[in-house]
Amino acid sequence: MVYNVLKYNIVDDEIEAVIEYYESLSISLGIRAENEMLSSLLHLKNHAHNYLLLSDNIHRRIPVKSFPYMFVYSIEDDIVIVKMLFPQKDDPAKLWERLIS
């Protein structure tokens, strides 16, 4: 099944902030971060069910290869809804706070 992938508006801001951070370290690192995040999002179009369910059994996560971030999303019918780009180093309690707010 091919899914439509939609993102909350804040996800674009989070992606841009991560790219800017890595570009401040190295332009090539910023480009690589952007490519890996886009690759993760594109992978959801065909493989959304392949990733780990979180403990609420509603949301899933897909890691961003080579970077300490993950996208958190849910699946509704044929739509993947990306809700956040979450730093894996952050306290998981923050993830749940953001999901319920």
What are these language model-derived features?
Residues D13, L25, L29-R32, N50, ...:
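Solvent-exposed interaction patches of small proteins and small membrane subunits
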Residues P63, V72-S74:
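Well-ordered beta-strand positions
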